[in-house]
UniProtKB/Swiss-Prot annotation:
GO terms for molecular function: structural constituent of ribosome. It holds the Pfam family Ribosomal_S2. InterPro entries: Ribosomal_uS2, Ribosomal_uS2_arc, Ribosomal_uS2_CS, Ribosomal_uS2_euk/arc, Ribosomal_uS2_flav_dom_sf. One of its GO terms (biological process) is translation. It comes from the Archaea. Keywords: Ribonucleoprotein, Ribosomal protein. It comes from Aeropyrum pernix (strain ATCC 700893 / DSM 11879 / JCM 9820 / NBRC 100138 / K1). One of its GO terms (cellular component) is small ribosomal subunit. The keyword Ribonucleoprotein applies. This is Small ribosomal subunit protein uS2. PANTHER family: 40S RIBOSOMAL PROTEIN SA.
Length: 205
């Protein structure tokens, strides 16, 4: 008899529908452990159970910090609205758009921030934040796609960190789970908005 599959934070179909499980055509050595299979088109598909497990782990970890001491970063445009939506509800600091050098390391800067933990949307796009956090010993939680490096990342959340639906769902889940753990929401209570309302507008090139 096979082991019973544990209940996930959201239905498995939602991870597929939002594209959270779909990686790139490149996979770094570390990220292989999160891969479920390679699709016929050559794209790596992530294991939704491992994504779900890491999201739960990240929410538990982040809920131990005072909200105002959590900085959430997104240079990537499709991550900016979800980050702001999360920070409005949790009470953390949103840093979106270009990251000014010295944000975490130069107290003389007007935009200086002194968080206890940093969440980044993409280790490559948000590299400035990752490097600075590492320099001053701030732990980094990151959404990591199959082609990303995990250098200076302390907690990896495997996920499609490019898609607007994917980023909306990920930040919606993190928001809900943090608020549940902090007692703001009941254990079975949802947010007052759907994950689609976390979604950025589509950008046409």
């Amino acid at each position: 008899m096979s082991a019973q599959v544990r209940e996930t934070l959201v239905p498995s179909e939602l991870y597929r529908k939002a594209g959270v499980i779909y990686g790139t055509q490149i996979c770094t050595r570390y990220m292989r452990q999160f891969v479920h299979r390679i699709l016929p088109e050559g794209y790596y598909q992530l294991d939704y159970l491992k994504i779900d497990e890491r999201l739960a782990m990240a929410a538990k970890f982040l809920s131990t910090f005072e909200p105002e001491k959590i900085a959430v970063v997104s240079v990537r445009i499709y991550g900016q609205k979800p980050v702001r939506m999360m920070c409005e509800r949790v009470g953390c600091k949103a840093i979106t758009g270009r990251i000014i050098p010295g944000t975490f390391t130069n107290p003389n800067l007007e935009h200086y921030v002194e968080p206890d933990v940093v969440v980044v949307t993409d280790p490559r796009m948000d590299r400035q934040a990752v490097v600075e956090a590492s320099k001053v010993g701030i732990p980094v939680v990151a959404l990591v796609d199959t082609d990303n490096s995990i250098e200076n990342i302390d907690l990896v959340i495997p996920a499609n960190n490019r898609g607007r639906r994917s980023l909306a769902l990920i930040y919606w889940i993190l928001t809900r789970e943090i608020l549940r753990r902090r007692g703001v929401l009941k254990p079975d209570e949802d947010l007052d908005v759907s994950y689609e309302e976390f979604m950025a507008r589509k950008v046409f090139k």
